[in-house]
């Protein structure tokens, strides 16, 4: 099954992959060669640390390549959903009790980062928002209890 991903999320993954292949991988290969030159590999902490780093980098490269190969990249600027919330929407919500506004973009599971306001399409918040329109109210089951929000705006930004 192909995982939905925004074009911006795919670009971030490609940039990380490129950095790992063009910067990190060559650096760790150099570090291994330098550590190997120090002699006995059994008690060579630098060598073992560099090999461990190499293993991590190669694992991350494989993971990123797999994620990108299974991603269905969706250009959200071409979605004609209007004010209806679907994948890729940037939604501004107002807490009905406090009037505090929060802004989230609904993205694929692999690119979600709550600190950046990117919520996974499989998250309870995103599932509650999908299909709603500007002006609709939505009730979210939060750890602190139920919260009610009003959908202030829906946009499809890249």
Swiss-Prot record:
Keywords: Coiled coil, DNA-binding, Transcription, Transcription regulation
GO terms of biological process kind: DNA-templated transcription elongation; regulation of DNA-templated transcription elongation
Keyword Coiled coil tagged: yes
Coiled-coil stretches noted in the UniProt entry, renumbered to this chain: 45-72
GO MF term set: DNA binding; RNA polymerase binding
UniProt xrefs under InterPro entries: GreA/GreB_C_sf, TF_GreA/GreB_CS, Tscrpt_elong_fac_GreA, Tscrpt_elong_fac_GreA/B, Tscrpt_elong_fac_GreA/B_C, Tscrpt_elong_fac_GreA/B_fam, Tscrpt_elong_fac_GreA/B_N, Tscrpt_elong_fac_GreA/B_N_sf
Protein name: Transcription elongation factor GreA
Cited Gene3D superfamilies: Transcription elongation factor, GreA/GreB, C-terminal domain (3.10.50.30), Transcription elongation factor, GreA/GreB, N-terminal domain (1.10.287.180)
Family as reported in the entry's similarity comment: Belongs to the GreA/GreB family.
One Pfam family recorded for the sequence: GreA_GreB_N
Functional note: Necessary for efficient RNA polymerase transcription elongation past template-encoded arresting sites. The arresting sites in DNA have the property of trapping a certain fraction of elongating RNA polymerases that pass through, resulting in locked ternary complexes. Cleavage of the nascent transcript by cleavage factors such as GreA or GreB allows the resumption of elongation from the new 3'terminus. GreA releases sequences of 2 to 3 nucleotides.
SUPFAM superfamilies, per the entry: FKBP-like, GreA transcript cleavage protein, N-terminal domain
